[in-house]
Amino acid sequence: MAPFQSNKDLISTGIKEFNVLLDQQVFDDPLISEEDMVIVVHDWVNLYTNYYKKLVHGEQEEQDRAMTEFQQELSTLGSQFLAKYRTFLKSKEPPSNTLPSS
C-alpha cells in the first residue's frame, strides 16, 4: 500500500479485497443455513469496516462520509452474495413429491 492513499483509493482497495473474499467461497457440504451465512457475511462486513476505519484520514466529516460509503458498498456486495447463496441452497432442496391435481 502506498504511504498515502486517498480515502477513495482505500475504499476501492477494500471493495476489491472484499470481492475476492466473496469470490473465494465454495458452496459445498456441509452446507450452513441461510441464517448462519447472514451472520458470517455480517461479520465480514464488520471486520472490513473496522480495519479500514483505522486507515481513512482527513477531517472527521470526510472520514465518516468515506466509511458510510464503504459500508454501504460492502453491504450491497454482501446482499448480492447472500442472494446467490440462497439460490444455491434452494437448488439443493429435494424436489417436492406432490402430484399435480387432475
From Swiss-Prot:
Keywords: Chaperone, Cytoplasm. The lineage of its organism: Eukaryota, Metazoa, Chordata, Craniata, Vertebrata. It comes from Mus musculus. It comes from the Eukaryota. This is Alpha-hemoglobin-stabilizing protein. GO terms for biological process: erythrocyte differentiation; protein folding; protein stabilization. GO terms for cellular component: cytoplasm. Monomer. Forms a heterodimer with free alpha-hemoglobin. Does not bind beta-hemoglobin nor alpha(2)beta(2) hemoglobin A. The keyword Cell membrane does not apply. GO terms for molecular function: hemoglobin binding. Expressed in spleen, bone marrow, and blood, with highest levels in bone marrow. Acts as a chaperone to prevent the harmful aggregation of alpha-hemoglobin during normal erythroid cell development. Specifically protects free alpha-hemoglobin from precipitation. The gene is Ahsp. It is found in: Cytoplasm.
